[in-house]
């Protein structure tokens, strides 16, 4: 199956510019490169009531989170968002635009979690951070203006894996 023409064009542009392939880089270089690529995207046009960075207590120190609050009233649902990146790359800034668009478009409070990454923090560090963030959101839902009965988990790639693993942890007690 051929690549989408836009994706192929983007990859061709990267190669022509001499971009180093990710698989040849060390994790810190990959993180810097992906954030550089994401910063080239146009900014979000979502209108939000607020976006704020915070920290919550974690199993090995503080966990950074970013809370995206849409305009609207009443207790809103929460989406706990876990970014992708193969458990090695990605952070709050990498998927900032996506979180803004999701909060504004769906009318949900998005809590993006900056879980610890490998290889510096091997499994289950990221999963423990993600589980801790969910427990925090459940406790703090009312203070956030959220409905504690409407908390969803989501993410892509590694973030989707964390979502599934948390669901299994909750099921299994």
Language model: regions and residue ranges:
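Short beta-strand element of the alpha/beta-hydrolase
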Residues: 75-85
């Amino acid at each position: 199956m051929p690549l989408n023409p836009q994706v192929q064009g983007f990859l061709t542009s990267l190669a022509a510019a001499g971009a180093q392939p990710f698989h040849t880089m060390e994790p810190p270089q990959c993180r810097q490169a992906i954030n550089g690529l994401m910063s080239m995207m146009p900014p979000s046009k979502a209108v939000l009531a607020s976006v704020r960075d915070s920290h919550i207590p974690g199993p090995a120190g503080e966990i950074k989170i970013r809370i995206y609050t849409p305009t609207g009233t009443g207790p809103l649902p929460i989406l706990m968002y876990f970014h992708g990146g193969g458990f090695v790359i990605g952070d709050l800034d990498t998927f900032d635009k996506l979180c803004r668009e999701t909060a504004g478009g769906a009318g949900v409070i998005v809590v993006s979690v900056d879980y610890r990454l490998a290889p510096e923090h091997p499994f289950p560090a990221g999963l423990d951070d993600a589980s801790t963030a969910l427990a925090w959101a459940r406790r703090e839902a009312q203070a956030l203006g959220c409905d504690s009965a409407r908390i969803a988990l989501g993410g892509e790639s590694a973030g989707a894996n964390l979502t599934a693993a948390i669901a299994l942890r909750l099921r299994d007690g």
